[in-house]
């Protein structure tokens, strides 16, 4: 019983998908113990589905929430628990989810991904373009001083888009200033995946399972106006729709498969080189090579 809750059925796969792509797409949710892609021996190609086994049932559940009905290589995939005797592609719960896809390979190969989201890009461009002129005056700027191992790596300066997502921006600003009595100082980037993202913000458990917002609980996705268009964008990590706390990630590349699932609320204005140093400490499974810490943080007044 326990095993079945750890094994996922992944259907609707494109021909290009192999075990490496699936590993990269699902590893952000937890440790993977096995991946099987059944072959059609006549064509010597896979049959369009696979099984992914996680070490923990809760990680498998998070993967379902985040990956079901997401895109991989331009195809919408279905992700649900594998049934013991008969594998059905029955839908689990539709979810836009997040941290997910945190899936770099999924996104990297998904450049045609926008076809399905056709109506959205024009809307995003129009709305993103307008507030830009007022950024400097109305939007707060915060910073993080980063330490890698025992050495200072430099400062990352970020502009928070309170003109677009005021509630999300205010949460992050207060966690940088510690004006509510808690925040990011002394916490670490616990998950770093090169060419994808650097995730931090868990200042309670320091492993991706904790953190809290200034609102005392999880808060809703404010909107998805801003998009994951390139490196240096600041976005909320989550465990499904409307589960924002304090965890965040900085993109290392374009990650447009996260659009509509994670709330983008800021961008790096200085210190992209420091972000690249953080990225260099990452690995395919997300475990940092050495500790990457937020030694100090605050707001520019």
Swiss-Prot record:
The reaction(s) this protein catalyses: [protein]-peptidylproline (omega=180) = [protein]-peptidylproline (omega=0)
Positions of the RRM domain: 5-83
Alphabetized PROSITE patterns for the sequence: CSA_PPIASE_1, CSA_PPIASE_2, RRM
GO MF, one example: poly(A) binding
Subcellular location: Nucleus
CDD domains named in the record: cyclophilin_ABH_like, RRM_PPIE
Alphabetic keyword roster: Isomerase, mRNA processing, mRNA splicing, Nucleus, Phosphoprotein, RNA-binding, Rotamase, Spliceosome
Coiled coil residues, start to end: none
Record EC number: 5.2.1.8
GO cellular component: cytosol; nuclear speck; nucleus; U2-type catalytic step 2 spliceosome
Stretch list, region Disordered: 110-141
UniProt family annotation: Belongs to the cyclophilin-type PPIase family. PPIase E subfamily.
Role played: Involved in pre-mRNA splicing as component of the spliceosome. Combines RNA-binding and PPIase activities. Binds mRNA and has a preference for single-stranded RNA molecules with poly-A and poly-U stretches, suggesting it binds to the poly(A)-region in the 3'-UTR of mRNA molecules. Catalyzes the cis-trans isomerization of proline imidic peptide bonds in proteins. Inhibits KMT2A activity; this requires proline isomerase activity.
Domain comment, as recorded: The RRM domain mediates both interaction with RNA and with KMT2A (via the third PHD-type zinc-finger), but has much higher affinity for the KMT2A PHD-type zinc-finger.
Protein name in the entry: Peptidyl-prolyl cis-trans isomerase E
Protein species of origin: Mus musculus
Gene assigned in the entry: Ppie
């Amino acid at each position: 019983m326990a095993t079945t809750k750890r094994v996922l059925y992944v259907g609707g796969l494109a021909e290009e998908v192999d075990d490496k792509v699936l590993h990269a797409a699902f590893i952000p949710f937890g440790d993977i113990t096995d991946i099987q892609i059944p072959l059609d021996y006549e064509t010597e190609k896979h049959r369009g589905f696979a099984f992914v086994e996680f070490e923990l049932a809760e990680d498998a559940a998070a993967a379902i929430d985040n990956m079901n009905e997401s895109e991989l290589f331009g195809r919408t995939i279905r992700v649900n628990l594998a049934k013991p005797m008969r594998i059905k592609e029955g839908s689990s719960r539709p979810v836009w989810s997040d941290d997910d896809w945190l899936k770099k390979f999924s996104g990297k190969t998904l450049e045609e991904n926008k076809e399905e989201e056709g109506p959205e890009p024009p809307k995003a461009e129009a709305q993103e373009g307008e507030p830009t002129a007022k950024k400097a005056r109305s939007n707060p700027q915060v910073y993080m001083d980063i330490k890698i191992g025992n050495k200072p790596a430099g400062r990352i300066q970020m502009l928070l888009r309170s003109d677009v997502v005021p509630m999300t921006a205010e949460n992050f600003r207060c966690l940088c200033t510690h004006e509510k009595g808690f925040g990011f100082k002394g916490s670490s980037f616990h998950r770093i995946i090169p060419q994808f993202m650097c995730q931090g913000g868990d200042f309670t458990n320091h492993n991706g399972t904790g953190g809290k917002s200034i609102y005392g609980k999880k808060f809703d996705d404010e909107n998805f106006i801003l998009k994951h268009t390139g490196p240096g964008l600041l976005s909320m990590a989550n465990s499904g729709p409307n589960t924002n706390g304090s965890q965040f990630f900085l993109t290392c590349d374009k990650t447009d498969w996260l659009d509509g699932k994670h709330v983008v609320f800021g961008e790096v204005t200085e210190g992209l080189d420091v972000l690249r140093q953080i990225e260099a400490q990452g690995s395919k499974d997300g475990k940092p090579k050495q500790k990457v810490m937020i030694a100090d943080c605050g707001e520019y007044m």
